[in-house]
Regions:
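Intrinsically disordered, low-complexity terminal tails and inter-domain linkers enriched
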Residues: 2-15, 106, 110-142, 272-286
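Glycine-rich phosphate-binding P-loop
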Residues: 21-34
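N-terminal phosphate/diphosphate-binding loop that engages ATP/GTP or pyrophosphate donors
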Residues: 32-99, 104-108
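Short internal beta-strands
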Residues: 50-52, 174-177, 202-208
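Phosphate-binding/switch loop-helix module in NTP-utilizing enzymes
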Residues: 88-118, 137-156
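Charged helix-capping and loop-helix junction motifs
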Residues: 157-165, 188-191, 216-222
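Inter-motif core of Ras-like GTPase G domains
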Residues: 159-179
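C-terminal lobe/tail of nucleotide-utilizing enzymes
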Residues: 192-286
C-alpha cells in the first residue's frame, strides 16, 4: 500500500502537490473550479488529476470532472456514489469505506507522480495568458485536486468528516465560497475549523454570482483583513460569474480562457510550498 508519507514528496526539482477543495456549503462552485483548474493545468503541461471521491444525488459533478480531464472513466474520478442526495454518512445501504477511499486516492497520487516524472526532461510552456514555464530549472509540480462533498465538517462515515480526508492525505485546503452577502462569516468559520484540526489553507476562491450584491465589492478585501495569520496562506482570489452554463462540460474550454489569468495566479501562488504533514487526527487542537 502506498502511504501518504511516501507521496508527500519534495525534491530539489520535482514535487507532487495535493489540494483538498472544500466549500462553505454545498452547491457553491467547487466542481466548476476544480474542473477548470484541472483543464488549465493539463493544457499547460502539468500532470494533474481531479477527483470527487464521494458523490451523492446525481452524477453531474462526476461527468464534469471526467470531461475536464478528457473522458476518464467514472472509476478514475469517483470512489463512492449514491443516488440519494444526502451526506455519505446518512446514505442507507452504502456504508463508506473511508480507508478504502484513502487507498484509492493514494493510488491516483502515485499515478500522477509517475506521469510527471515522465515529463522531467520537458519544459512546459503555456500558449495562453499566464502560461506556465519551468522556473530556474524546476520541473512543473504534479497536482492532485481532491474535491470534498459539502463543507469541511460534512460527515463521511462514523467519526470521519471531510476534514478527516484532508488530514489523512496531508493536503492543503482550497476553500471555495460564493461571493455574496454572508460569505465572510462562512469563510472565517471554515478556516478556523481547519486550523483547529491542523489543516493548512492554501487560498480562498470566491465564485461570482449571477446577481452580484453590494457585498461582492468588498468581500475579498474584508476576508483578507479578518483572516488570522496563516502559515502558507497564499491569498483570496475572485472568479467572475461564468453564466448559467458554467457547469456544462461542453463549455470547459471556453470558460478556461475566460478565467485563464486568475487560474494562473492561483497556480503560481500555491505551487511553491513545503511538503504537507500527515497523520493528524480529526480533533480540534489547543
Amino acid at each position: 500500500m502506498v502511504s501518504s508519507d511516501d507521496l508527500n514528496l519534495m525534491t530539489d526539482d520535482l514535487r507532487l502537490e495535493t489540494f483538498l477543495l472544500v466549500g462553505t456549503d454545498t452547491g457553491v462552485g467547487k466542481t466548476v473550479f476544480s474542473g477548470l483548474f484541472a483543464r488549465y493545468l493539463m493544457d499547460n503541461g502539468v500532470g494533474v488529476q481531479a477527483v470527487k471521491p464521494f458523490c451523492a444525488g446525481g452524477k453531474a459533478d462526476i461527468e464534469f470532472l471526467q470531461a475536464a480531464r478528457g473522458g476518464l472513466g467514472q472509476e478514475e474520478v469517483n470512489y463512492w456514489y449514491s443516488e440519494e442526495p444526502v451526506s455519505p454518512a446518512a446514505a442507507e445501504l452504502k456504508a463508506v469505506d473511508f480507508e478504502g477511499a484513502i487507498n484509492w486516492i493514494n493510488s491516483l497520487r502515485s499515478a500522477v507522480f509517475s506521469h510527471q516524472e515522465g515529463l522531467s526532461g520537458q519544459v512546459a510552456v503555456g500558449s495562453g495568458q499566464g502560461g506556465l514555464q519551468s522556473v530556474g530549472g524546476v520541473r512543473q509540480a504534479g497536482v492532485l485536486l481532491v474535491e470534498g462533498v459539502g463543507g469541511l465538517l460534512a460527515p463521511l462515515a462514523k467519526g470521519r468528516t471531510v476534514a478527516s480526508l484532508g488530514q489523512a492525505l496531508g493536503a492543503q485546503l482550497i476553500v471555495v465560497a460564493p461571493n455574496r452577502v454572508g460569505v465572510i462569516n462562512h469563510v472565517l468559520l471554515t478556516v478556523e475549523a481547519a486550523a483547529k484540526r491542523g489543516l493548512g489553507v492554501a487560498c480562498v476562491v470566491l465564485m461570482g454570482q449571477r446577481e452580484a450584491d453590494l457585498s461582492s465589492l468588498d468581500n475579498a478585501a474584508l476576508i483578507r483583513d479578518f483572516l488570522p495569520e496563516l502559515a502558507g496562506f497564499k491569498g483570496v482570489f475572485e472568479f467572475p460569474w461564468l453564466g448559467v452554463g458554467a457547469d456544462n462540460p461542453g463549455q470547459i474550454g471556453v470558460n478556461v480562457k475566460k478565467v485563464e489569468k486568475v487560474l494562473a495566479e492561483i497556480y503560481e501562488a500555491c505551487r511553491l510550498r513545503g511538503p504537507s504533514g500527515s497523520g493528524v487526527t480529526d480533533q480540534p487542537s489547543g
